[in-house]
Amino acid sequence: SGKDKIKLQKKKKASVVVAAKKAGSAKVQAKVGKKKYVCKVVVKAKTVKNGTSAGTKTTNKPADTKNATKNPSNGQNNAATQPTNNPSKDNPSKDNPANPTATPAADSDVPKKNEQDVKKLQALIQTLNQKGADISANLDDESVYHWNKEGRLTEIYWGEKKIIGAEMADFNEFTALEILDINNNNISGTFYVGDLANLKELKCYGNKIDKLVLDTNKNLQELDCHNNQISNTIRLNDSKNLERLYCSNNKITELDVSGCDKLQDVDCSNNLMSSLNVSDLPSLKSLNCSRNMLKDDNLILTGSIGLINLDCSLNGTNYDFINLNLAGFTKLESLNCSEQPEDGGTSADDTMEFDISACTGLKTLNCSYCSIETLDVSNLSNLETIDASGCNLSEITLDGAVKLSSLNINCNEITDLHIPETNEIKTLDCSESLGIETINFAVLTKLESLDVSDSYVPELDFSICPDLQVLNAMNTGFGNPDATTDNEDLPNIDIDLKSNAKLKDIDMSMVNVNVLTLPENDIVANLSASNSAVTQIVNLEKQLGLETLNIAGTGISALDLSANTNLKQVSCTESQKTGITGVDESIIYIVPDDSDDGEDGNEDGDDGEDGNEDGDVELE
């Protein structure tokens, strides 16, 4: 048809008319996540100049009347003035109405609408519009209504129509209704969904409904009622065909999905549930029950071993996630049990070991800000990402996690971080880990991002990390100090980054470094060495793509930046400004100079060791 790109609107329908050899129609539907897209295609038959349809055989050229008169024996005397193609079933023409392809009606496939449905729908539209709604009264608008072959109303799309005062009883007489979408209106009160036996999808999210009752909706496949004020128990045990349930951001205290064997996706996050039983649901793939009030070990998953994604984070002080039984959950790929308070159901005297060894298919683990002392992922050969930041970890075992590419263990108490020689780690965050004494950095040959800020680490040979792109070493003490050593007592060293040809962002603020050598190419975009011992930056003139530079509080007093034509901001102290040349003064940002205020800080009370709190300009 040439119309291979048809724009489909969100939760709406579109239609298009095309020409082809044969007439007909079709409805194309697609779902992307929770969104539904529908397009009706009407096909008209192509016609040619003589009025026949494309692909229809035409007759021979009419006989020559002159020759026919001279030779009557050919049998075409008077008939020669007419075409030889007489209209028939096998030889159609524009004058033959029996031919279905000759002049197809655009609406030939559209059935007559059910009179009762039309009458009730028109009355409901009028009533709601009188209350301030903005609902289309065009019953042929396929972005709003859909009718089946019997003329019954099967789909209503009234999302964001300013509806006030609608009740479920208003829709119960549309007994053929399969999809009802009334999202983001101002509907309040109780919603009883009982008489619509054919209803498959109900989307009433973004309203003010405080009670939702679904008793006999056995054909319901999707319920989306998130962002309401629902406070009652949601019972769906009779909805045996339910596949998707989204009821987050309500006040639900209990959820009954027992027997929903087809249920695949559940999001009941941010409610008031103290227990949740989703056991023996063989089709369940995704469960988000975060931000509830689950107590003890009242999240029951037994038998739902097809689960792929589980989020049970942020569940209050009484939730004992440590005892979460995940035995047999070999298909689980993503687990988020983060941000559980320290007294999360486990006494301080217990050994807090999180056992996930049975989850052999796990790819992503987030157990950040939980009370875990030891973490063993050696059996998880598919694990790619670990976020164990902010825990009480003293030990983590990584042997066997051969696909691990991202490791975040900042703010822990690990003293010895052993990384397997065979690893795929590209991102490592061990910042704010003052207790780390040994890290075998030599095996991190694929590292792209490293954060060792606010830590003490051994001297690093950065040449082993040729793919390094981001380096954050702010307030890091390089050397082998004990945990009581102050950065000022560490000997100054030189840092050589010339082998790191992919390094884009460097933060060497507040470090004991004298000479900082940059890569020889022009890849670095952001560089900060503020309040450090740096007196020289080698290869700075080669950084043609440099955008931000912070040398405030360093030992650098003179700097020619004429080669760095892409600079957008240079941060320095007032005393350093006079030594900076080659850039426009408009991009120079003055950081208050501590030396002007004496040992006790300035008059405004910024009396820390590093001077004004605003002295550091963070890299974007």
Regions found by a protein language model. Give the residues of each.
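Conserved hydrophobic beta-strand positions in leucine-rich repeat
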Residues: 156, 180-182, 202-204, 221-225, ...
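Conserved hydrophobic position(s) of the canonical leucine-rich repeat
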Residues: 153, 177, 188, 199, ...
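N-terminal capping/linker segments that flank leucine-rich repeat
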Residues: 28, 93-179, 186, 197, ...
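Extracytoplasmic soluble-region selector
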Residues: 1-74, 81-82, 87-90, 95
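Intrinsically disordered, low-complexity Ser/Thr- and acidic-rich flexible linkers and loops
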Residues: 316-318, 340-351, 479-491
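Asparagine/serine/threonine-enriched low-complexity, disordered tracts
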Residues: 50, 60-61, 67-99, 103, ...
